């Protein structure tokens, strides 16, 4: 298939683009220029790879989940272990790349948004490493849900700003972070945490996260002598999924499955299934599928997992849905919790609640596949951060 996105204006079909105020246009153009140069600079690539290897701990293993495979009785199940990265999730693949870019551009300060706190921790971590000042915006509700991550960020030297506006979640944190960037743009780089925002952010994040899919491809071929038949990843904004899917987009024999949060059910108001239930609109500088009402007001997204309750989804996912290259599904809070417990009991691996959505969908998919077929799950993060809230949730139930 002929797939080459984004185009030079930063569009993925009708999606993406740069819907930003004049005050930011210069900065996003400057960022695009700096990014292009860095990508062609061997020294930059060498430095990035050095940190990915010695600091992040790449490459991460592709693990054959024998017990899960036996339990499902279908396809061989493999886990791409992004939970084993330094800081416990895929987020650092992107933050290390963007922080090196910030240093290259002569910026002294970094601003970022965070939902579950994973991107905030990964950003604060690389800022500590590279001596950058760090400000993190986090919704008030998420601050409550993720107290430990807030403390971690502060330990790492970051200033955490709690955002009470709106629903006090990720969307509101992004609003405030963008506002902050507008007024500090001369010395500050904004590290977007997902494949969202105005061009070139969705491309930058996708490219830095593509290390996931590139490694998976190589590792799976070494183990099985072919490509996997199916690849599954969870989707909030969509960066772990985009990093996993992008290297496989041209391999049409590989089925790609994105898994959103159905929350209390897609028939209710309490979900974050943007690609299942959303419509096209503009948010945070980019055109994409959104959860919005008939007046175009953004609706609140809900998920048991703080990292999936974003009311939009990356522009590239929006395109991949429309052209049918990726098949998007949703998993409820209860299904994700069940998968969380199952993987923990069967493999001794505690997945993040976000990743548990991908595991839950894989549990439905694997039994429908043949025994000589392979299914890879992107295990995007570890579940230590969620154990406390899961304990609470299970006690209430």
Swiss-Prot record:
Q: Which UniProt keywords apply?
A: Amino-acid biosynthesis, Aromatic amino acid biosynthesis, Lyase, Pyridoxal phosphate, Tryptophan biosynthesis
Record's superkingdom? Bacteria
**Pfam families in UniProt:** PALP
Reaction(s) catalysed by this chain, per the record, are: (1S,2R)-1-C-(indol-3-yl)glycerol 3-phosphate + L-serine = D-glyceraldehyde 3-phosphate + L-tryptophan + H2O
Please give the InterPro entries that the UniProt record associates with this protein.
Trp_synth_b_CS (IPR006653), Trp_synth_beta (IPR006654), Trp_synth_beta/beta-like (IPR023026), TrpB-like_PALP (IPR001926), TrpB-like_PALP_sf (IPR036052)
Using the UniProt record, name the top-level EC class of this enzyme in a single word.
lyase
Subunit text? Tetramer of two alpha and two beta chains.
Per its record, how is this protein called by name?
Answer: Tryptophan synthase beta chain
Question: What is the species of this protein?
Answer: Bacillus cereus (strain AH187)
């Amino acid at each position: 298939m002929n797939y080459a996105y984004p185009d030079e204006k930063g569009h993925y079909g009708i999606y993406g683009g740069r819907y930003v105020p004049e005050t930011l246009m210069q900065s996003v153009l400057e960022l695009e220029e700096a990014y292009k140069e860095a990508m062609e600079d061997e020294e930059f690539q060498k430095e990035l790879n050095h940190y990915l290897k010695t600091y992040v701990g790449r490459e991460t293993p592709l693990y054959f989940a024998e017990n899960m495979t036996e339990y499902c009785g279908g396809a061989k199940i493999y886990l791409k272990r992004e939970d084993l990265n330094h800081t416990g999730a895929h987020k650092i693949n992107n933050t290390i790349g963007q922080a090196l870019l910030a240093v290259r551009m002569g910026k002294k300060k970094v601003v970022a948004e965070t939902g579950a706190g994973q991107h905030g921790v990964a950003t604060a971590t690389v800022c500590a490493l590279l001596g950058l000042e760090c400000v993190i915006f986090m919704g008030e509700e998420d601050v409550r849900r993720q107290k430990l991550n807030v403390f971690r960020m502060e330990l790492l030297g970051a200033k955490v700003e709690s955002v009470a506006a709106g629903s006090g979640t990720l969307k509101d944190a992004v609003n405030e972070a963008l506002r902050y960037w507008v007024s500090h743009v001369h010395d500050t780089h904004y590290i977007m945490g997902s494949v969202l925002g105005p061009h070139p952010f969705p491309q930058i994040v996708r490219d830095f996260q593509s290390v996931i899919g590139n490694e998976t491809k190589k590792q799976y071929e070494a183990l099985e002598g072919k490509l996997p038949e199916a690849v599954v990843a969870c989707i909030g904004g969509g960066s772990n999924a985009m990093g996993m899917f992008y290297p496989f987009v041209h391999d049409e024999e590989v089925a790609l499955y994105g898994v959103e949060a159905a929350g209390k059910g897609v028939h209710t108001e309490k979900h974050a299934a943007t690609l299942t239930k959303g419509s096209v609109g503009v948010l945070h500088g980019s055109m994409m599928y959104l959860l919005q009402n008939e007046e175009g007001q953004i609706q609140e997204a809900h998920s048991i997992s703080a990292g999936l309750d974003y009311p939009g989804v990356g522009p590239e996912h929006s395109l991949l849905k429309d052209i049918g290259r990726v098949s998007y599904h949703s998993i409820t809070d209860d299904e994700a919790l069940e998968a969380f417990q199952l993987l923990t009991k069967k493999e001794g691996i505690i997945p993040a609640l976000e990743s548990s959505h991908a595991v839950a969908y894989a549990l439905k998919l694997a039994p429908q596949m043949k025994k000589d077929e392979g299914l890879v799950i992107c295990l995007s993060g570890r579940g230590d951060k969620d154990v406390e809230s899961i304990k609470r949730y299970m006690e209430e139930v």
